[in-house]
Curated annotation (Swiss-Prot):
Keyword vocabulary terms for this entry: Membrane, Phosphoprotein, Virulence
Positions carrying Phosphohistidine: H66, H79, H154
Domain ABM: 67-158
Organism: Staphylococcus aureus (strain bovine RF122 / ET3-1)
Listed name of the protein: Signal transduction protein TRAP
Length: 167
């Protein structure tokens, strides 16, 4: 099964990993407070101590020139089956939105926080999608909140923006 491995750190540290491993498909982005690098592969990763997710639904390919939103969706053991079933069954007509590039639904290898990556041409086209009924009905905090479990989990749903690195 294909997996997505992610690590956060400084730009220089992560960029050195990328430079030293040209045979691996490593993608590096800038976040609000650090950099992130990830590798999507069925092989072993070069990343040390990454977060590991299984890719359970995918559309399109990753590209370092695109903007990404990573949505972290908390759940509990009691709700993961229903959450996963709902997210897998979502009609992927969102791919018809202007600027849409890619999508990944990810199951955690450890824990119960699922992750979704939406790739768009830029942040504005993602924000347009985020204001759509498709997003509000299927991917918003409100749409998914009954899969979170205890009320303390609600604050754990969050988005992290990944920006292309301009050198």
């Amino acid at each position: 099964m294909k997996k997505l491995y992610t690590s956060y750190g400084t730009y220089g540290f992560l960029n050195q990993i990328k430079i030293n491993n040209p045979s691996h498909h490593l993608f590096q982005f800038s976040t609000a407070d650090s950099s992130v690098i990830f590798e999507e592969t069925e092989e072993n990763t070069v990343l040390k101590s990454p977060s590991i997710y299984e890719v359970i639904k995918e559309i399109g390919a990753f590209n370092e020139d695109h903007f990404y939103c990573a949505i972290f969706i908390p759940s509990t053991e009691d709700h993961v089956y229903q959450l996963e079933k709902k997210l897998i069954s979502v009609d992927d007509n969102f791919k018809n939105f202007g600027g849409f590039k890619s999508y990944r639904l990810l199951r955690p290898v450890k824990g119960t926080t699922y992750k979704i990556y939406f790739g768009f041409a830029d942040r504005q086209t993602y924000e347009d999608f985020k204001n759509s009924d498709a997003f509000k009905d299927h991917f918003s905090k409100e749409a998914l909140s009954h899969y979170f479990g205890s009320s303390g989990q609600h604050s754990s749903y969050f988005e992290r923006y990944l920006y292309p690195i301009k050198e």
